[in-house]
Amino acid sequence: MNMQFRNSSSAAVMAARFLFFPLLVLTLFWADTGKAEILLRDAAGRQVRLAKPAERIVTNESLLLLELALIERDPVSKIAGWAAPRRLDRGVYESFRQRFPTIDAVPVVGGVVPSNTNLESLLSADPDVFVVSLWDPGWQEIAAALEAAGVPTIFLDAPGKSARNPAEAIAFSIDLLGKALGREPEADAFSAYMLSHYQAVVDRLASVKTRPLVLMDAFAGTECCSVPGGANRLTDYLTLAGGRSLGADIIPGYEGRLSPEAVIGEDPPVYIGTGGPHLAGQGGLVLGGGMDAASARASLQAVLSQGVRKELTAVRGKRAYGISHQLAISALSILAFECFAKWVHPELFTDLDPAGTLDEINQRFLAVPLEGTFWIELGETP
């Protein structure tokens, strides 16, 4: 595997700032107003103009809160409206509520997808900018209408399969937000930190010839198994971490289902289930904010005792793991990536410490520390 991210030294990071991220940003200062106009190019290749650093953001994805918390000391104050806040891990939401009680007053506007969004709802929040986390062609019409009303739209996700690898895509997204909010130093610092951690893993994998097969059991519940397809970023993370995702070669889209017969026929040596608090009422894998390790492990054990899972070599050999789905698809995906690398190639990464990485991110970057159990190993000593 031959892949190079930005150099982790600060001087080299700044010197090579746009090697992987051709993000066009021009800031024009007007002496008569004291304001700065910002021009940037988003993930969809669109040139976006902001009259000044954004103070009021409306977004279609409540998970943007974590991204904002990496570069803003008061991320909640920047959110003028959002869609589906209940999608957030409730333990994480409660942590933010303790620090920023006004989070409960953030209005719910629009929807996660364009078909559930109307222009009037978005405009009612009086936004400086509308931020879209996941591309959908339907957003283009809404973006055009917002533009006509004087509100720019920033796409953090590219249409189609991105040419950027997962680490580059996250850094690009952080970079965009940093420019839009006038928080470039903070965005630079986190991007450099994250990319250096990705690079350390990728460098060590360069000489590895074997790529173990992994069952990535998405939203692990009573039935097995829904798996990420070839176009899913989870598949990209696992590939970059030196593994192969079962089913990704036959499921070209975002996700699909594998029959129990297909799963046991392949009998992958590694099992990774994803879950979250929202699966508690469905008999699924529950882990996340505010949860202790013993409860998370018990949940993983319960899921693994069901159906075909208990027959797998991975489960019998205690190479079975669980991880927060939201963590894995968030701006903090470096934590999931380090877990994947450690689980897929344990002999190569005995010293890799995702928990230590989380501690450092909590101390150096996050406005609200991420506390709870976001990943668990079946073979760990309780």
Question: Which positions does each model-derived feature cover?
Answer:
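Structured C-terminal subdomain patch of bacterial secreted/periplasmic proteins
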Residues: 110, 164-182, 188, 192, ...
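Short helix-initiation/N-cap motifs at beta->coil->alpha
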Residues: 43-45, 104-118, 251-260
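A short, structured surface patch at a secondary-structure boundary
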Residues: 59-61, 65-124, 129, 134-135
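Extracytoplasmic ligand-binding site segments that recognize negatively charged/polar headgroups
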Residues: 86-91, 138-143, 156-174, 209-233, ...
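N-terminal secretory signal peptides that target proteins for export/translocation
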Residues: 1-14
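Alpha-helical, coiled-coil/dimerization segments enriched in small aliphatic residues
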Residues: 229-254
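Bacterial N-terminal signal peptides
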Residues: 16-29
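Bacterial Sec-exported substrate-binding components of ABC uptake systems
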Residues: 30-69, 185-218, 349-382
